[in-house]
Structures are given as structure tokens and as C-alpha cells.
């Protein structure tokens, strides 16, 4: 029936999302140390969930375009977290663990990371003003990209440093 087919689609999308997250995490573990990889990976669902909370407010639905937008922005979310996280770790290796070295690490990359994110937001923003059928179809793309990147900035400058500030394993 139509309902069971719809539930099957939801299950497939959920499974694909979990598999995608697992692959991102696995890749991060191969490239980074386990602690940093874990906190960088946790930034993805935090940024996505923060954005999803505002979907209804902006009239965004979960569909193929919104899923595509989430995939497009995934790499940017991970990239920002890796840049900030790696710089924090580098400062901690030089000055020792603690809030001072963590803050120094964040401050050093705050401007370039913010400028990079804002540039991406500005690049996607004109799609908001496209009219016609294409505008109706793709109008959600910039909203999602901007929302996710906004929450990503909050995550990499507030949540990620808080987790990496102490010298404990987790």
C-alpha cells in the first residue's frame, strides 16, 4: 500500500543517513586521532538538527532537494570543524591542554573560517530570488545551506572547543 511504501522510503533514507554518517566518521578516524574525529563527527548531527528545527519556520520540507542540500553542505561542516579542531590540538601541543590554548587556537582561525562560511552563504543566497519553476524547486537549497552553516559556526566556535579544552580523553 501507499503507506507501507512511504514507510519503506523513510526507512531507506534513515539507513542511508546512518550509513553516510558512519562513512564520514570512519574517514575522519583514519585521517585524525579518535578523539578529534569523534567531536568533529558529532558536529554534523548538531548542525543538521539545529537547521532542521527551523525547517517549518522557513517552509522547508524534507524532500530530494533538501536531502541534496544537506549532502552539499556536509563537507563544509566537516571542513570547518577539522580546521578549528586541528588548530586547537596544535596549540595544545605547544602550550598544553587548557582553556587558554584552546581559545588561542580558536581565535587564530575564527576570521578565515567565518569568512569562508559567509562567502558560501552569499554564493547560495541569490537562488532565493530565482522565480518560476526552478525557483520553486531549488528555493529550499540556499535556506538549508545557510541554516546548516549558521549552526556549524556556532558548533565549531562554542561546542567543539568546549569538548577539546580539557586534557581528558573525551
Give the predicted meaning of each segment.
Residues 1-7, 11:
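Single conserved hydrophobic/aromatic residue that forms the stacking wall/gate
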Residues 9, 24, 41, 45, ...:
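Residue-level signature of catalytic and energy-coupling elements of molecular machines
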Residues 12-21, 33, 37, 105-116, ...:
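Loop-to-transmembrane-helix entry motif
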Residues 14-63, 129-133:
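Interfacial segments of transmembrane alpha-helices in multi-pass membrane proteins
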Residues 26-27, 54, 84, 88-91, ...:
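Hydrophobic alpha-helical interface/terminus motif in multipass membrane transporters
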Residues 27-31, 43-44, 56-57, 61-82, ...:
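Hydrophobic transmembrane alpha-helices
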Residues 74, 78-86, 110-129, 137-170:
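Transmembrane alpha-helices and their membrane-interface boundaries in multi-pass membrane transporters
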Residues 85, 91-115:
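Helix-loop junctions and hydrophobic alpha-helical segments within the transmembrane domains
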Amino acid at each position: 500500500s501507499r503507506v507501507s511504501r512511504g514507510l519503506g522510503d523513510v526507512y531507506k533514507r534513515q539507513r542511508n543517513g546512518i550509513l553516510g554518517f558512519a562513512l564520514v566518521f570512519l574517514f575522519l578516524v583514519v585521517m585524525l586521532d579518535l578523539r578529534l574525529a569523534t567531536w568533529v563527527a558529532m558536529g554534523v548531527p548538531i548542525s543538521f538538527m539545529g537547521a532542521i528545527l527551523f525547517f517549518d519556520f522557513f517552509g522547508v520540507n524534507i524532500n530530494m532537494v533538501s536531502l541534496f542540500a544537506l549532502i552539499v553542505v556536509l563537507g563544509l561542516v566537516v571542513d570547518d570543524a577539522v580546521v578549528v579542531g586541528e588548530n586547537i590540538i596544535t596549540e595544545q601541543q605547544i602550550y598544553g591542554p587548557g582553556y587558554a590554548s584552546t581559545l588561542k587556537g580558536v581565535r587564530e582561525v575564527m576570521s578565515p573560517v567565518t569568512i569562508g562560511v559567509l562567502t558560501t552563504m552569499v554564493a547560495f543566497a541569490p537562488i532565493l530570488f530565482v522565480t518560476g519553476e526552478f525557483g520553486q524547486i531549488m528555493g529550499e537549497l540556499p535556506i538549508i545551506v545557510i541554516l546548516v552553516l549558521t549552526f556549524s559556526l556556532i558548533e565549531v566556535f562554542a561546542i567543539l572547543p568546549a569538548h577539546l579544552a580539557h586534557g581528558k580523553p573525551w
